[in-house]
């Protein structure tokens, strides 16, 4: 495995700490007036999702984690899970529902997802940052709603995601949604 020095730490770098894969979320280089310089990093565990802070003396090195990403298309979902396919090799991968809990509301057939693999095993599935989804259910906008200060209303998309949309959005319309926050971005014109 490749080792990286503290001078090579950067946000997004995948490292192995205590045998577990982590991604660096924040890296602060600290040079105190007295004593040795050090790096204080905030890292997120890929397996548990827990965020911790670690400190490394300047010049120390740690192993990089064997974490890689693979782009795959969602073919279909069934009672077992979701089946993804690599567009280049046509290799198919079944991911069980227990690994899809965080993205279940964003699963849409024929969409490209990022599968995060650690030592060859899928540890998470990441949806695209922005998705175009159809509004399946929402209350009609009532005239005068904006006068009372109410400009958003709840809506359910065709994937089952519950989001807040502006009152002018109606059922059947396509909207752009940020999957990181679950928020409405814009109306999509066809």
From Swiss-Prot:
It is found in: Cytoplasm. One of its GO terms (cellular component) is cytoplasm. Keywords: Cytoplasm, Elongation factor, Protein biosynthesis. GO terms for biological process: peptide biosynthetic process. PROSITE patterns: EFP (PS01275). GO terms for molecular function: translation elongation factor activity. SUPFAM superfamilies: Nucleic acid-binding proteins (SSF50249), Translation proteins SH3-like domain (SSF50104). InterPro entries: Elong-fact-P_C, NA-bd_OB-fold, Rib_uL2_dom2, Transl_elong_fac_P/YeiP, Transl_elong_KOW-like, Transl_elong_P/YeiP_cen, Transl_elong_P/YeiP_CS, Transl_elongation_fac_P. Signal peptide: none annotated. The keyword Amino-acid biosynthesis does not apply. Pathway: Protein biosynthesis; polypeptide chain elongation. HAMAP family: EF_P. Involved in peptide bond synthesis. Stimulates efficient translation and peptide-bond synthesis on native or reconstituted 70S ribosomes in vitro. Probably functions indirectly by altering the affinity of the ribosome for aminoacyl-tRNA, thus increasing their reactivity as acceptors for peptidyl transferase. Belongs to the elongation factor P family. This is Elongation factor P 2. The gene is efp2.
